[in-house]
Amino acid sequence: LGYAETTVSAEVQYIFNTLLFLMSGFLVMWMAAGFAMLESGLVTSKSVSAICAKNIGLYSIAGVMFWLVGYNLAYGIPEGGYIGTFTPWSDASSVDTGYSDGSDWFFQMVFCATTMSIVSGTLAERIKIWPFFLFAAILTGIIYPISMGWQWGGGWLSTAGFSDFAGSTLVHGAGGAAALAGAIVLGARSGRFSSSGGVKSMTPFAASSIPLATLGVFILWMGWFGFNGGSQLAAGTLEDVSSVA
């Protein structure tokens, strides 16, 4: 299927690209509600309030840390390098970039927060709230931005030819690795296994609300439209819009 050749002004492309970043970012941010509901529905009733607090807190921490150091750690990296600069993000938008810097920061920040949301689900009922927040600051401010910059920021993985679309490795690989490390260090939920290694009855660990967890799954499904569609990073041409669709 071909497209008639069209000419779109830089200003129009700037507007549509920025709108794509913002609208997709809103959908990805809505996934935070999905994670919170899914986790809250699957943990025991006594842990629901802690799960909600952790999900609200990790997003707040991610926003602050990604503004303070995260964005420039990822995008301030020299070509083929390993780490950017420890400086706060500042908006320096121009039409030449093809999109608003602020919309790009927001879109990348919600990806960063999603990485920590992956960890939250694994560590549910395994970790206290303040150590969790401390790790959230480290992951969203340092670990994820550095690994993100290796490819999306033009770092050594990018120059080596590695490609990542929609964070299949950078988001889910980083989040999964951090979650696995946390699970290994912290161990199983207290009281889940007997001294001989056998699994105890699930009665004390019954899910608090399966309908709530189900609603969380549907919200996450909806959020993926922003996560994957927005990763086209452009909506200023027919080809770009077709790719988003």
Model-identified regions with their sequence ranges:
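Hydrophobic alpha-helical transmembrane bundles of multi-pass membrane proteins
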Residues: 1-245
